[in-house]
Regions:
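Cleavable N-terminal export/targeting peptides
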Residues: 1-23
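Short loop/turn motifs that connect adjacent beta-strands in outer-membrane beta-barrel proteins
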Residues: 19-23, 86, 90, 159-168, ...
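Residues that define the transmembrane beta-barrel architecture of outer-membrane proteins
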Residues: 22, 42-46, 72-76, 83, ...
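Transmembrane beta-strands of outer-membrane beta-barrel proteins
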Residues: 25-31, 51, 60-64, 81, ...
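Outer-membrane beta-barrel translocator domains and adjoining extracellular loop/strand segments
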Residues: 38-43, 71-77, 100-109, 140-148, ...
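Surface-exposed loop and membrane-interface regions of Gram-negative outer-membrane beta-barrel proteins
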Residues: 57-83, 88-112
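Outer-membrane beta-barrel "beta-signal"
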Residues: 193, 199, 219-230
Length: 230
């Protein structure tokens, strides 16, 4: 009994600080267009976020639903990640209402008949710049011949402050053939510059807004996106 009591005390000593550090994040963005890594995924959308983090670990849920075009694909992403001293790793489960399963069932995970895509990622933030690599390893990601595509994406990003706003410049590329990104080999799909700032509405309330210019050299498309955060 004494040993059991000692073990319980040790567990409580470890868990209590972790409980004190648990943080919950709730928010939402409204965007004029849904652009993902240089690829258009839909028109204006509402994108809510729910995240819980503690001790470098984070579990999050992120969604997107069209608010103008009812034909836009709905999306629900679940991510589990760990960050330590600038380094981060994680896995994301992307689910789309359209895909290999014509019924759009969430709990259908069979590889060749699912609307899920599982992606692993790793990155490092140097402070003045960051680099991230993402690779799909399971789900609805196939080449035209039916083989697995293992679609991958790499992004370099650099934040800076200027002209009363917080800016981020980014360059992203796809290293190999990927129908998901619309490439048949190495291609730059994302060159973007985004500015974010808070607009004061009243003395006690400010509205965070962002505007970003994104160019996709691979698809020869360009987008100007407005975002509002809550």
């Amino acid at each position: 009994m004494k040993k059991i009591f000692s073990i319980v005390l040790v567990i409580m000593a470890v868990v209590s600080p972790l409980r004190a550090e648990i943080e919950t994040t709730v928010g939402a963005d409204v965007v004029s267009e849904y652009i993902f890594r240089g690829v258009k995924c839909g028109d204006a959308a509402l994108q809510p976020t729910l995240a819980i983090s503690a001790g470098g670990f984070e579990a999050s849920a992120w969604g997107s639903v069209g608010i103008v075009n009812h034909l836009d694909t709905k999306e629900l992403d679940l991510t589990l990640s760990y960050s330590l001293a600038g380094a981060s790793i994680g896995v994301t489960d992307y689910w789309f209402s359209a895909g290999a399963d014509p019924y759009g069932r969430y709990f259908k995970y069979k590889g060749d008949a699912t609307n899920h895509i599982f992606e692993a990622f790793a990155g490092y933030d140097f402070g003045f710049a960051s680099i991230s690599w993402y690779t799909n390893f399971y789900g609805n990601d196939f080449k035209v011949d039916g083989s697995k595509a293992f679609s991958s994406y790499c992004e370099l990003a650099a934040p800076f402050s200027a002209l009363g706003a917080e800016w981020t410049a980014a360059l992203g590329f796809v290293p190999m053939e990927s129908p998901l990104y619309g490439t048949d080999g190495f291609a730059v799909t994302n060159i973007s510059l985004t500015a974010a700032k808070s607009i004061e509405i009243t003395e006690s309330f400010s509205l965070p807004v962002s505007a970003g210019l994104t160019v996709n050299p691979s698809s020869e498309m360009a987008y100007l996106i407005l975002g509002i955060s809550f």
